[in-house]
Amino acid sequence: VEFYQKMAPLLPTKTVIATNSSTLLPSQFAKYTGRPKKYLSLHFANSIWKNNTAEIMGQAQTDPAVFDQLVEFANQIRMIALPVRKEKNGYLLNSMLVPFLLSGLDLWASGVSDPKSIDIAWTHGTGAPKGPFQIIDTVGLATAVSIVNQYQSVPGLLSPLLKKMMMPYNFKTMSKLLQDMLDKGEKFYG
């Protein structure tokens, strides 16, 4: 909030402001930007040189013309523009990815299997290039700890189906296991 409050007076009024967060909703900050009609999100996936997607999400006050300009901008910089028409934590990619990662973590934290076997089950079973723990190593353990803690503490982020599938105590177990690894400087691979 403070960042936007300090930045807003320094920018010309024509300036469009975009955040790259896929966790925070633009509506949470729009009023602090001094230009809510020109404030929205432009979220890039990791490794944009090969996974060149850009999720564009406005908020209730975003001018539709500004939204369209940002979609066009994403196309101009050779991204695959993915318009998100309604605010949603996680946007498109992470709304699908996070439950997948949490499912892998649940299998590990419950003692069902080890990270390598879980990754092999996924990669060989689906043809995907990476399993959940390889992806966690890519995004970083600090991000994984943050995700687990957020999903543990914010009601409504986790779908009812996934809540039923996972034992509730596992969020605390997952968080502790990941934090211990982070504190030791460990990763799942390498």
Where do the language-model regions lie?
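Rossmann-like NAD(P)-binding element
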Residues: V1-V16
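Rossmann-fold dinucleotide-binding core
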Residues: V16-R85, N94
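N-terminal alpha-helical segment
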Residues: W49-T53, F100-L101, M174
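NAD(P)-dependent Rossmann-like dehydrogenase/reductase catalytic/cofactor-binding core
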Residues: Q61, A65-D68, N75-K88, L105, ...
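An alpha-helix initiation/capping motif
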Residues: G90-V98, D119
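Short acidic alpha-helix initiation/capping motifs at coil-to-helix transition points
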Residues: S95-F100, H124-G127
